[in-house]
Amino acid sequence: MDHLRELFGSLGFSNVETFIASGNVIFTSETEDARTLEKGIEDHLRESLGYEVATFVRSASELADISRHRPFDPSDLDAEGNSLYIAFLPAPPSAEAEQKLMVYRTEVDDFAVHRREVFWLCRKKMSESSFSGALLEKAMGMPATMRNVTTIKKLAAKYPASE
């Protein structure tokens, strides 16, 4: 993670930190446009690492909104063995992509789309589900990265939006 922090620092970002070893990087930038930031980071990582790295930028206020969003019944979220995952996308999915995703709904897996995120309620262990990140990317027609809602809540709490 030290190398990742250095790469982001070399882009001119300040207050660069990593959060758990899964590629979450927190930074301050004068540029506010997420797509501009994503493109610049992706280009720099490709040049520095020699391979493509899909990048998904969210502001602190967006992260707070995502952490508070409740697309499913609370009883489903509290049930033993159920987990909620949030997939980050580079853009809002099309209606056609949403329809493709909903084909994967089962008694185990349910989905809700909210802006540039897909919420996945898994009513078993992720490893026991027939759904996967690869199927999500195929349905959406774009790259995605997934985090457990607990990670998102921790990020939002540790890095609150400034008022």
Residue ranges and their predicted role:
Residues 1-163:
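Surface-exposed, charge/polar-rich loops and edge strands
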